[in-house]
């Protein structure tokens, strides 16, 4: 335990030093200095770590929250820079690999698709929303081109300039792919009836950076998505929580969803993935009662078989609570 505490303390000290250096940068636009500092930060955060960011002291928590905001801003500058670079080509989609982290998006999108088809049986999406698509909508593009060829994608971002950059990438694109990608400038909080039309909604990691903001976004989606529709939420785990917000699966459940899987990759894919399904009011109330029963009996959610070697998946709380209750009754 003492060794773990020392490891966590050393990591937090290192990250605090990087935060201090990044905070002093005159600009977060791509440059040799910016790239070097964020590379060091990612290198420090990606390996498995015993750190639990929820248990950090107030000063470290404030540092972490500010660091996530800085990461978000730097990511926006980086994506805008490469979106402009790619748009200079006659067919931008032929040059996506020039973006240094394109492979990560390919792997993350494949992971999300694999989890979706495994834990939402029979799903065959025809309408998909991606909330927080940004100027480089790689996730939607990879999903549309390689995994969901029959689906139409509506991409939402609050920034009109980001959407304009995204549209330019599809100049000269295959008519089928280009026709299936639409971009809308809107805050998710203003979307109501539109959300009920989607079979799947993907929620980007940086939409709602504070825990209460993220919970509010998820609750809004739960209030307006159709019963049975799937929600895919990007989160983080361990030290990766210094780079992206961590989403509590309980906030997803409280938002009106049945959490089907929680996956924490252990490779170069930084984001964790939560797959959930919208349930009706009656089912949500019943699930809440079962969860309360499970909590009162001390049920610990087990880890079940992973869909790949890079992650661990948490089973549905509802199913496990029911299984525990059934076994308990049989033993009485």
From Swiss-Prot:
Keywords: S-adenosyl-L-methionine, Transferase. It catalyses: 3 S-adenosyl-L-methionine = nicotianamine + 3 S-methyl-5'-thioadenosine + 3 H(+). Its EC number is 2.5.1.43. One of its GO terms (molecular function) is nicotianamine synthase activity. The gene is NAS1. It is an enzyme of class 2 (transferase). GO terms for biological process: nicotianamine biosynthetic process. Coiled coil: none annotated. Synthesizes nicotianamine, a polyamine that is the first intermediate in the synthesis of the phytosiderophores of the mugineic acid type found in gramineae which serve as a sensor for the physiological iron status within the plant, and/or might be involved in the transport of iron. Expressed in roots. Belongs to the nicotianamine synthase (NAS)-like family. Gene3D superfamilies: Vaccinia Virus protein VP39 (3.40.50.150). This is Nicotianamine synthase 1.
């Amino acid at each position: 335990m003492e060794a773990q505490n020392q490891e966590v303390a050393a990591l937090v000290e290192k990250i605090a030093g990087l935060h201090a250096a990044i905070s002093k940068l005159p600009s977060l636009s791509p440059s040799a200095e910016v790239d070097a500092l964020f590379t060091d930060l990612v290198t420090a955060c990606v390996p498995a770590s015993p750190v639990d960011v929820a248990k950090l002291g107030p000063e470290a928590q404030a540092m972490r929250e500010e660091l996530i905001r800085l990461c978000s801003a730097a990511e926006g500058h980086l994506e805008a820079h490469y979106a402009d670079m790619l748009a200079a080509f006659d067919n931008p989609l032929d040059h996506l690999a020039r973006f240094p982290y394109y492979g990560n998006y390919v792997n993350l999108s494949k992971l999300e698709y694999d989890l979706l088809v495994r834990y939402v049986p029979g799903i065959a999406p025809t309408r998909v929303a991606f909330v927080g698509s940004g100027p480089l909508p790689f996730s939607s593009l990879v999903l549309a081109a390689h995994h969901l060829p029959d689906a139409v994608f509506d991409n939402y971002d609050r920034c009109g300039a980001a959407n304009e950059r995204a549209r330019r990438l599809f100049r000269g694109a295959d008519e089928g792919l280009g026709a299936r990608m639409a971009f809308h400038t809107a805050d998710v909080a203003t979307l109501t009836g539109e959300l009920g039309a989607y079979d799947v909604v993907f929620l980007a990691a940086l939409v709602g950076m504070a825990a209460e903001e993220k919970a509010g976004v998820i609750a809004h989606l739960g209030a307006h998505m159709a019963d049975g529709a799937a929600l895919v939420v990007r989160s983080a785990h361990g030290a990766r929580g210094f780079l992206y917000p961590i989403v509590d699966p309980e906030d997803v459940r409280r938002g009106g969803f049945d959490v089907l899987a929680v996956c924490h990759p252990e490779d170069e894919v930084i984001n964790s993935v939560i797959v959930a399904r919208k349930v009706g009011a009656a089912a949500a109330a019943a699930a809440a009662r079962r969860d309360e029963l499970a909590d009162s009996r001390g049920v610990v959610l087990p880890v079940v078989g992973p869909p790949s070697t890079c992650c661990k998946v948490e089973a549905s709380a509802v199913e496990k609570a029911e299984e525990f209750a059934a076994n308990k009754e049989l033993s009485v």
